[in-house]
Amino acid sequence: MADPRTFLGALFDLSGKHILLTGASSGLGRHFARTLARAGARVAMAARSVEKMAALAQEIRAEGGLCDVYALDVRDREAIRACVAAAEAVAPLDALVNNAGIARPRAPEKLSDEAWDEVYETNLRGPWVLAQEVVKRRLADGRECSIVNIASILGIRAIGHLAPYSAAKAGLINLGRDLCVDLAERGIRVNALAPGYFITEMNDEWLASPAGDRLRQRVPAKRFGKPEELDGALVFLCSDASRFMNGNCITVDGGHTAGV
């Protein structure tokens, strides 16, 4: 019998794949960039903070990984088009990971139109414009591709004070379903990955607070996730292992959405 490690390695191998990742400068995006590069992909890292990504790129390249850095504000349509065009000039994109996102928690009565628009444009309209730009190119050349929308369990359930965030993440999940119906037969798959609560440098202090501890008690696993515990699902969705999976949402949350 063949070595199972060889079989699994080939199944999930991202070597030769070109993947555009947004929100790559911090939080889960920073971790995702390393993960995809370690799995063999050439990662087109896009975010507003070029300096942070430049430092990350040095680390990835020091490990033998392949990556490029692109300045991108996902609220800017023209910047999106320019970013996708620049990445495509390097090589056709095999996958898009829509990871950029913001929260802006507010009580409903205190939520301004500007805050709502900022969250919506970052978390839903930006991913849509990015997906559309990539889809146009893949339909033109007939290549298959995978679009992975990083959603949230807050697109499935709610905790309050996050109306635009929850609405946008729910929209992101259903955007994938609708695009699947239109694009599946043409070799384009669109799925969502909905993390629960994961510890990053962006939220570690809050998750360690009394309020964070109360939230932890609601997770059946009785702990928060570690970024590396998203690696399997992310690589799966970007790889050929998920070629017949489309319009779905994978939750990785320690059982959070299964609880009351």
Residue map of PLM features:
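Substrate-binding pocket helix/loop in short-chain dehydrogenase/reductase
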Residues: A107-P108, A115-Y120, N203, L215
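Residue(s) in the substrate-gating loop at a strand-loop-helix junction
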Residues: S152
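Alpha-helical segment proximal to the catalytic Tyr-Lys
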Residues: K136, V181-E185, R243
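Short, small/polar-rich loop/turn modules that mediate ligand/substrate recognition or access, typified
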Residues: V97, A184, R189, M245-G247
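Conserved glycine-rich cofactor-binding loop
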Residues: H18, S25-S26
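Short C-terminal tail/terminal secondary-structure segment
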Residues: A2-A10, R157, V235, N246-V260
